[in-house]
């Protein structure tokens, strides 16, 4: 409620102010942070944004003195730095924090049949991923998920953070009465990093002991490994 009140007051106080593209406003921040917050903000000059109350990195400045947005209707001060980040990922490798994805674990002997009923797509084989929408009783889209089959009776799901409370409520309302399915929603107890770019596989290979070569770790494959 503190966050909502502060944001409502901030919005009302600026009702006649000019709002710039991509402008981030300060009220009630930081409301929630990830375990990587201090590392990104203080050690890597991150400029943070507000994603449904969660502090997430927008871009990284070369020095602490430059780590702030200057809102503009033209190219702002982040243009050069964001461009360098994009080129780095396109040409070499980069890391993106993905804490702003909702994460769930569905377990139990009835998990696969339940997900097949709840989602529009068929569940994948063990060690594979699938992308699938979720519809309500009227056939309207209410969610879009990435689902991995981690093992028999165990699925890991990624979805929208902003809709996570609604989605969890929908899951709970449609659980079978026999207790054959359990759903757990992770929050800041499980965050993630995405390694991306042409050299992503090289970086991952140096961090884990499993074989992540192209022949053994294909597109849409799912593996669990210790780092």
Model-inferred region functions:
Residues 2-227:
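Glycine/proline-enriched, intrinsically flexible loops and inter-domain linkers
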């Amino acid at each position: 409620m503190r966050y909502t009140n502060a944001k409502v007051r901030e919005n009302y106080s600026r009702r006649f102010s000019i709002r710039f593209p991509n402008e981030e406003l300060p009220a009630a921040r930081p409301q929630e942070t990830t375990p990587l917050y201090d590392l990104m903000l203080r050690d890597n000059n991150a400029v943070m944004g507000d994603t449904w109350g969660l502090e997430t990195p927008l871009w990284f400045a070369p020095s602490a003195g430059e780590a702030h947005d200057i809102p503009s209707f033209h190219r702002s001060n982040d243009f050069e730095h964001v461009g360098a980040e994009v080129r780095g990922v396109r040409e070499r490798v980069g890391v993106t924090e993905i804490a702003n994805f909702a994460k769930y674990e569905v377990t139990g002997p009835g998990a696969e049949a339940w997900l097949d009923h709840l989602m529009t797509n068929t569940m994948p084989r063990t060690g594979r991923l699938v992308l699938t929408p979720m519809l309500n009783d009227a056939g309207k889209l209410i969610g879009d998920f990435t689902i991995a089959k981690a093992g028999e009776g165990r699925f890991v799901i990624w979805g929208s953070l902003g809709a996570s409370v609604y989605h969890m409520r929908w899951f709970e309302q449609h659980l079978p009465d026999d207790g054959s399915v359990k759903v757990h929603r992770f929050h800041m107890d499980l965050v993630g990093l995405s390694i991306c770019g042409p050299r992503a596989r090289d970086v991952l290979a140096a961090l884990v002991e499993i074989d992540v070569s192209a022949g053994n770790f294909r597109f849409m494959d799912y593996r669990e490994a210790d780092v």
